[in-house]
């Protein structure tokens, strides 16, 4: 696995790093987030904060999930520091799953 790309978001005080085995258009990629100055553990411990899954249309995905009763703590819309369309859903244990629209 290798670092494919990395980007700092000074306005949001976080860095995103994307790792994988090949080109992002044809291979699975893991997005790692480093929140600058995070001193306290996250709500559910310090193992991880959330997973992200790429989907073709975040808005339509959220509509389908909401109609199935899935909790959506952050509705679909553009990311404040980057412009990608994202949303967050919660699993039954309270872990967040980010939905990010694939380009």
Per-range role (PLM):
Residues 35-96, 103:
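Vicinal oxygen chelate
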Residues 12, 17, 21-24, 45, ...:
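Generic signature of intrinsically disordered, low-complexity segments enriched in small/polar residues
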Residues 1-27, 67, 80:
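Core segments of cupin and vicinal oxygen chelate
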